[in-house]
A protein has these predicted regions:
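Conserved phosphate-binding/catalytic loops in two-lobed NTP-binding clefts
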Residues: 115-140
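Flexible, glycine/charged-enriched surface loops at secondary-structure junctions
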Residues: 11-13, 61-69, 127-130, 153-156
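A short, charged, Gly/Pro-tolerant segment at domain boundaries
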Residues: 155-173
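A contiguous, well-structured pocket-lining segment that forms one wall/lid of small-molecule binding clefts
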Residues: 17-98, 107-121, 148-151, 168-173
Length: 173
């Protein structure tokens, strides 16, 4: 939604990231998500609303919106919300491996911040190649389509519980 406000094409993740790279940011002060009593929870609705309101206010008062700076400050606000929570989750669980995936893992600011935070914490970070960091829903749907074509159809008793531990996947590499 932030990409749409900035006039970027859909899907907006990659265009927003490219636009953000054109600025050092620090121009717009955007809110960070905070949920009292739930240090791992987050919501980006306030951030989205802030971007929309900022863009509309800037237009209403006749000022020019620095689209690149807003893209950068938005991406940094997402990263500043996400990365500390990921690190806190590692701390709470005692784990030393973090994996990021999906569209959010394609963002260069988030990737860089995760790399620095994991290096500082002495944990391993797994990031898929950028070409594999797309919309997870689309990937799951595409795989489901090919499974269906191959005749692999599950009945209604199928659940979403993992049947293989991530450690097995990590050790397979």
């Amino acid at each position: 939604k932030a990409a749409r406000v900035l006039g970027l094409p859909y899907p907006g993740g990659a265009p927003l990231d490219r636009l953000a790279q054109q600025s050092q940011g620090g121009v717009y002060r955007l809110p960070l998500s905070h949920v009292d009593g739930a240090p791992l929870d987050m919501s980006f609705s306030g951030l989205k609303t802030a971007v929309v309101n900022l863009a509309h206010h800037t237009q209403q008062v006749g000022e020019e919106l620095d689209r690149a700076a807003l893209a950068r400050d938005f991406a940094q606000a997402v990263s500043d919300t996400l990365v500390p929570r990921a690190m806190e989750a590692l701390r709470q669980t005692g784990r030393k491996v973090l994996c990021a995936a999906g569209g959010v893992a394609a963002n260069s600011i988030i990737r860089g911040d995760l790399e620095r935070a994991c290096a500082k914490a002495g944990c391993r970070l797994y990031l898929p190649p950028l070409r594999l960091c797309g919309d997870n829903g689309a990937m799951i749907g595409a795989q489901g389509y090919y499974e269906y074509l191959a005749g692999h159809v599950a009945d209604m008793s199928l659940n979403a519980y993992a049947t293989r531990a991530i450690e097995a996947e990590i050790n397979a590499d």
